[in-house]
Amino acid sequence: MKGNNFNLLGNITWLWMNSSLHKEWSCKLLACNVIPAIENEQYMLLVDNGIPIAYCSWADLNLETEVKYIKDISSLTSDEWQSGDRRWIIDWVAPFGHSQLLYKKMCQKYPDMIVRAIRFYPKQKELGKITYFKGGKLDKKTAKERFDIYQEELATALKNEFNFIEK
């Protein structure tokens, strides 16, 4: 990691430490989630008067890497963060109530994209739910159609991965 990125890493780590969900996570997961985002410039950090207020990162995965990520959220290598065109939010940290602002900024930056995330809740840390978000210019119908296609492809890949047999 380049020297000028250490301040950035410190700002993001500070946000993690102030998040009720993230502060319980390991340094290993911090490194897996944050360093590749910085190296690949796949993040957004919001700062107000010099103080970090919100952060998110994303990876553009191919289907194979997506399956790997679903099975183990800490499994992505730095190279895999740019392996395809299936965008996933890896991290979303807004411990001071700036989540809506971060969402607005992401919608502006990526107006035509479908983005998915595994959403974790503080009381259910072992169980995540796949959610999706759409860019600001994408209509709901088109977004739903794209999401459904992604989900069908993912479901098929997961069935094949785990050798599920349909009755």
Swiss-Prot record:
This one is known as Leukotoxin-activating lysine-acyltransferase LktC serotype T3
**The enzyme's E.C. designation:** 2.3.1.-
- The transmembrane residues are none
Major subcellular location class? cytoplasm
Q: Which UniProt keywords apply?
A: Acyltransferase, Cytolysis, Cytoplasm, Hemolysis, Transferase
Reactions this protein catalyses: a fatty acyl-[ACP] + L-lysyl-[protein] = N(6)-(fatty acyl)-L-lysyl-[protein] + holo-[ACP] + H(+)
Originating organism: Mannheimia haemolytica (Pasteurella haemolytica)
What is one Gene Ontology biological process annotated in the Swiss-Prot or TrEMBL record? killing of cells of another organism
Q: Which family does it belong to?
A: Belongs to the RTX toxin acyltransferase family.
